[in-house]
């Protein structure tokens, strides 16, 4: 019986090569590998070919020994007790009851309004997948802000109303008109990367003014300014969602554990699209310990220390900007954003001294650099470096 040809029609941009089998380099039945540089492009969703992926601190990389570009905690916390890993051969609970209970006790939000996720990033994606129709619906953001809202939307072919914050980094006067029609309206508070905050009353106005949208308040850094949280408004407003994470104040960025807080109707929809096992057993164990009384006490102590070091760094940056031109925004998270008239000079100064901070391509942040708060040792070096530039 004759064998049909592998390819009856010529294919463009295709390379066919022979790969020796594992048994013998001279085996006549060598494996045939067809390589095509355009196969993925031909099969991919067209909108993804134009998508620029989110440039995380890890993707951007850098060289140095002081890493203050990702708003990570300098504290490498070990577990406060023994981890129970005796069930690693079994799939974990979708929503580990002990973890949900621990976060409920910490946040004051009832368990039925909590979903645990792989960081707040997954929660953002879940909301877009659950509520936005690709090619039809849109989200709204107020920038400059965290880039993953827009990236997640674009990944699912959901439109983005990229609105601007006011000159004072608050919600603009026409926010309700500008955001109207968006299924999801994202407000980052404290805002990343500016570190600025929006008053609780102003956010409540937004929730009231957009009854047909879900207002998503990202509180990733709320432990640094808890008085600005709107989690207590969940009982009042069915269109409010609050995002939280253990990556920042709890120093568990590597664990990837976040929470979505919302009314039960929204939670029920989210649970329809969430992965069956989103929280690995070791992550749940570590997170539960972080949310124990001892873990929370440690977090609060570390937040206080980070705020102290942040105040020192902000003061040094202010002195530099007074002499060389620029401005420093008042920090409310574990980072501070400074705008420099001589930003290229500052960037080189940091690079030459092994310091990796965060710069931006956004035109609104062309002169800005964000500095994460770090240890006393790191802060000593930063303060000394900027003080050495005195005229």
UniProtKB/Swiss-Prot annotation:
Belongs to the class-II pyridoxal-phosphate-dependent aminotransferase family. Histidinol-phosphate aminotransferase subfamily. Its cofactor is pyridoxal 5'-phosphate. It catalyses: L-histidinol phosphate + 2-oxoglutarate = 3-(imidazol-4-yl)-2-oxopropyl phosphate + L-glutamate. The gene is hisC. This is Histidinol-phosphate aminotransferase. Homodimer. Pathway: Amino-acid biosynthesis; L-histidine biosynthesis; L-histidine from 5-phospho-alpha-D-ribose 1-diphosphate: step 7/9. It comes from Shewanella oneidensis (strain ATCC 700550 / JCM 31522 / CIP 106686 / LMG 19005 / NCIMB 14063 / MR-1). The keyword Amino-acid biosynthesis applies. Its EC number is 2.6.1.9. One of its GO terms (molecular function) is pyridoxal phosphate binding. Keywords: Amino-acid biosynthesis, Aminotransferase, Histidine biosynthesis, Pyridoxal phosphate, Transferase. Transmembrane segments: none annotated. Gene3D superfamilies: Aspartate Aminotransferase, domain 1 (3.90.1150.10), Type I PLP-dependent aspartate aminotransferase-like (Major domain) (3.40.640.10). GO terms for biological process: L-histidine biosynthetic process. It holds the Pfam family Aminotran_1_2. The modification N6-(pyridoxal phosphate)lysine is found at residue 248. PANTHER family: HISTIDINOL-PHOSPHATE AMINOTRANSFERASE, HISTIDINOL-PHOSPHATE AMINOTRANSFERASE-RELATED.
């Amino acid at each position: 019986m004759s064998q049909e040809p592998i390819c009856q029609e010529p294919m463009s941009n295709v390379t066919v090569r022979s790969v020796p089998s594992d048994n013998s380099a001279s085996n006549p039945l060598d494996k045939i590998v067809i390589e095509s540089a355009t196969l993925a492009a031909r099969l991919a969703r067209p909108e993804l070919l134009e998508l620029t992926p989110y440039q995380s601190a890890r993707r951007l990389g850098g060289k140095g020994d002081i890493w203050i570009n990702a708003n990570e905690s300098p504290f490498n916390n070990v577990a406060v007790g023994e981890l129970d890993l005796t069930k690693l051969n079994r799939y974990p609970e979708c929503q580990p009851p002990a973890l949900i209970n621990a976060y409920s006790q910490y946040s004051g939000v009832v368990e039925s309004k909590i979903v645990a996720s792989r960081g707040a990033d997954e929660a953002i994606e879940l909301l877009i997948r659950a509520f936005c129709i690709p090619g039809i619906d849109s989200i709204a953001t107020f920038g400059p802000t965290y880039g993953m809202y827009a990236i997640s939307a674009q990944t699912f072919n959901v439109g983005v109303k990229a609105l601007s914050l006011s000159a004072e980094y608050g919600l603009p006067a026409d926010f309700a008109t500008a955001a109207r029609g968006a299924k999801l309206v994202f407000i980052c508070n404290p805002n990343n990367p500016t570190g600025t905050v929006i008053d609780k009353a102003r956010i409540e106005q937004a929730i009231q003014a957009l009854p047909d949208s879900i207002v998503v308040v990202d509180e990733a850094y709320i432990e640094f300014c808890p008085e600005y949280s709107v989690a207590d408004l969940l009982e009042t407003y069915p269109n409010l969602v609050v995002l939280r994470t253990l990556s920042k104040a709890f120093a568990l960025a590597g664990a990837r554990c976040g929470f979505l807080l919302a009314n039960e109707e929204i939670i029920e929809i989210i649970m329809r699209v969430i992965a069956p096992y989103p929280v690995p057993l070791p992550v749940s164990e570590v997170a539960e310990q972080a949310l124990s009384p001892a873990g929370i006490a440690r977090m609060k102590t570390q937040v206080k220390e980070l705020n102290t070091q942040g105040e020192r760094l902000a003061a040094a940056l202010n002195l530099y900007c007074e002499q060389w031109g620029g401005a420093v925004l008042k920090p409310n998270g574990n980072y501070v954003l400074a705008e420099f008239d001589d930003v290229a000079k500052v960037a080189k100064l940091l690079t030459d001294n092994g310091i990796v901070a965060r710069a931006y391509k956004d035109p609104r942040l062309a002169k800005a650099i964000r500095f994460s708060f770090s240890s006393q040792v790191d802060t000593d070096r930063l303060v000394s470096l900027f003080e050495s530039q005195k005229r």
